């Protein structure tokens, strides 16, 4: 089987509400839309594949151009089932400028389409092709607005097992108090995660982690900048609050470092930031070897 054609489409979808750093405060200059880049791959058989990537903020035009030009030339004519070899080929091509960043965002759409073709050619759902280990998976809800407790309880009744609360607007005490109120209102049976997207320094993160430890928060996600390996080591050594990291990581090597260091309980890879399912699976394999949980961020439909 060979790839014969790649076509793309660019959709710019208005957001229903501005991106937020907390339950109350929108980001300065917050993006008001999400850009989706769709890729359709055709083959010399009857099988075609669909993939997509997303951007919130700048870069969509660049990603679209990369897909249509360099990346299309790299993959058309290749066997779509050879996902590892194609990833290596693309990474080698981008070595002079680096694969992480917009190139990975662009290739993610192609890689997802490759897996779509591979599963269709095998005649099985993608989940089964990847092993089919879990018949079902728990899920949580995030970015709740309005009456957070009421809306959270409603979604829990519909099957959600937890709630993810974003913080980081600047008033640390006010947000800590809000987290406590939400956690106590939802009850012990509801899993609660607090996400900061790397907005705190180590001292503030340590204080919050101790506070969350006292009130029984289940996970503190990305409390300090992603590249601060030493900071995560110090934070993990001073708190029992489970830590998660990875929503801002742009390479699988970054995940390998934190997994091997043993500072976090959960890693949160973004399939688009990493460059697709192929690199995400490599992260999952290493995480399993070190008994670290994997909870992909965004694009749960993939």
Language-model features: locations:
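Flexible, glycine/charged-enriched surface loops at secondary-structure junctions
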Residues: 83, 125-129, 222-226, 297-298
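Conserved beta-strand positions in the central sheet of alpha/beta enzyme cores
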Residues: 162-164, 221, 268, 295
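N-terminal capping/lid subdomain adjacent to the active-site entrance of alpha/beta enzymes
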Residues: 1-192, 197-199, 203-206, 210-214
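Shared catalytic-loop signature of beta/alpha-barrel
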Residues: 210, 216, 227-302
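Active-site beta-loop-alpha junctions enriched in small/polar residues
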Residues: 142-144, 166-170, 195-201, 223-227, ...
């Amino acid at each position: 089987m060979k790839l014969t054609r790649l076509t793309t489409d660019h959709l710019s979808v208005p957001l229903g509400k501005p991106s937020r750093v907390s339950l109350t405060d929108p980001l300065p200059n917050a993006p008001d839309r999400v850009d989706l880049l769709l890729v359709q791959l055709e083959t010399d058989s009857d099988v075609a594949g669909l993939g997509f990537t997303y951007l919130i903020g700048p870069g969509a035009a660049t990603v679209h151009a990369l897909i249509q030009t360099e990346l299309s030339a790299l993959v058309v004519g290749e066997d779509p089932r050879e996902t590892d070899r194609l990833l290596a080929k693309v990474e080698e091509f981008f070595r002079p400028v680096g694969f992480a960043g917009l190139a990975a965002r662009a290739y993610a759409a192609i890689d997802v389409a490759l897996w779509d073709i591979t599963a269709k050619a095998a005649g099985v759902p993608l989940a089964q092709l990847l092993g089919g280990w879990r018949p079902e998976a728990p899920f949580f809800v995030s970015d709740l607005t309005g009456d957070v407790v009421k809306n959270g309880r409603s979604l829990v009744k519909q099957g959600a097992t937890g709630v993810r609360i974003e913080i980081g607007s600047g008033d640390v005490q006010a947000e800590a108090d809000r987290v406590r109120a939400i956690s106590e209102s939802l009850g012990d049976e509801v899993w609660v995660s607090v996400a900061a997207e790397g907005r705190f320094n180590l001292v503030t993160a340590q204080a919050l982690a101790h506070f969350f430890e006292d009130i029984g928060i289940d996970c503190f996600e990305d409390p300090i900048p992603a590249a601060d390996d030493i900071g995560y080591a110090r934070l993990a050594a001073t708190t029992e609050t489970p830590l998660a990291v990875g929503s801002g990581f742009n390479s699988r090597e970054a995940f390998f470092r934190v997994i091997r260091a043993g500072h976090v309980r959960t890693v949160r890879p973004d399939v688009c930031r990493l460059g697709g399912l192929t690199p995400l699976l490599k992260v999952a394999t290493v995480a399993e070897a070190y008994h670290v949980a994997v909870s992909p961020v965004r694009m749960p439909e993939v």
